[in-house]
Amino acid sequence: MPAVCVFFHPDRSPAVPFSPVPSPLVSAIVLNYKTPQHAVKCVQALMKQTIVDRMEILVVDNHSEDDSIGVLRNRLSTFPDVRIIETPENVGFGAGYNLGIRYARGKYLLINNPAKLPELHAAERLLSLMEKDESIGIAGPKLMHDDGTVRDSYRAFPGVTDVIIKRTFLRSWFPHRMQRYLQTGTNPDESRDVDWVIGGCLMIRRDLAEKLHGFDPQFFLFFEDIDLCRRCWAAGKRVVYYPEAVATDRKRRLSEGGVASLLLKPVGRAHIASAVKYFWKWHGAAAPR
């Protein structure tokens, strides 16, 4: 009997039984879309976490339409605590994670992109931070590239002008504004309250996620993390960057490049669409911090 449980449709019962961790404290959710090998490596990294005995792992396949499900079922069959959930269609980043949240049982949720590999103590350190301070709603780790360079893991809330300047020749004209937006003048080795952290790897309290109704599904890809952190601050909880927890990021930002390069790529056009939705949603609203 397979050890991995697959939900072929979210509203149906599991196809086969699995062996859940009793009363997990942390639910780690991995969202896969056509990168099953990365998802497997991510699960393997999660299984090495120092608090794995208090964690459950859910892998959501976002209707990849390739061999992802077969690869995941085969490669993860040795991990009886892992659940695989298959969406009936590609519902996007936020909605995909929301489905995982729906089935998660932990007090804390670790949102983990397959490209992010948490180091041995990462989950434990994020958990310890949040257990000690009830005012923290979301915590994000320091992200490192494979070459040892630090990836920007947090930024200030953007304005329309910030996004335009960053994508055009105007960037060199307004270096101080870009430094404020990109937070490049801050020390990545110091913990601090930040406007928002990268959604590819963060821990959020389950009760807060439920109060906020998870990610806003109108953002198919990009800006859902900014929106979530903004609502976290508005709900009276803090967003904290915590570099004592570290994760390796195997990919560069999907949304890098100027306006022209964004328009030429589907992922770039998705970024623009989400930006329009974000600024429309928050138009006229005061920053929550």
What are the roles of these predicted feature ranges?
Residues 187, 195-213, 218-246:
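A short, conserved alpha-helix in the catalytic core of glycosyltransferases
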Residues 45-54:
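Short, acidic, metal-binding catalytic loop of nucleotide-sugar glycosyltransferases
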Residues 158-195:
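Short, flexible, basic/aromatic active-site loop/helix in glycosyltransferases
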Residues 9, 29, 226-289:
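Active-site-adjacent helix/loop segment of glycosyltransferases
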Residues 109:
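Short aromatic/hydrophobic "clamp" motif used to bind/position activated sugar donors
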